[in-house]
């Protein structure tokens, strides 16, 4: 299908600051896509997954022009689950051409990200693959769904083999057991050694951030971050478009 015919369902787009992750506090353009294949207990954007949610359809070129017109270099593709949008690679291919942009894809961990990674184009696979890792302006923030989500059984674990140094893993935790599971994943897949960003976020009302810090101290988890969602301290936690 040609780019002109491919459309994406967008439920909202806005400029604000990144509330979490490696670029927390920096301006970003958020593009939220409709629909999700999971139903997490603590999801704060379930409205975007409802069958009757209102949306606008954009082509690849229209989304690219939206991004350029925003004059913001950090772009977060979120949802819902952006990777279940048909023909997402057509959009990513377009965005990869513009190295002035820093694209972050927030994905729920159930979709195989390998499908969306850049592939070598010649027989010199290793050299090109290494170059693509260093030059790719598209990164993934992989959300590992711990037990508190009710969706842990949906995790596609091979994703953790394919993570690169520019990618991030986020664990939303609600108990010491969730923290222990996060530690197991971090160690099993050598996420620190890979250079991935690693963040632990508390599920509101389930665990105290101080207990998370104590867990890091007790287990000497270097290069692992406890993060609180910055935007929820600045605005009402239920407010949209911020």
Task: Tell where the protein language model's regions lie, with residue ranges.
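Short hydrophobic/aromatic-rich motifs at helix boundaries and adjacent loops
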Residues: 34-36, 63-64, 155, 184
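N-terminal [4Fe-4S]-dependent radical SAM core
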Residues: 1-32, 37-54, 232, 236-242
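Conserved AdoMet/S-adenosylmethionine-binding subsite of the radical SAM
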Residues: 84-242
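Conserved Radical SAM active-site core
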Residues: 8-11, 27-28, 39-137
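Amphipathic, alpha-helical segments enriched in basic
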Residues: 6-11, 15-18, 38, 42, ...
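Short loop/turn positions at the edges of beta-strands in beta-sheet-rich folds
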Residues: 35-37, 71, 220
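Generic, low-specificity signal for short hydrophobic/alpha-helical stretches with a mild N-terminal bias
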Residues: 13-18, 45, 73, 77, ...
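Generic structural signal for well-ordered alpha-helical scaffold segments
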Residues: 18, 64-68, 187
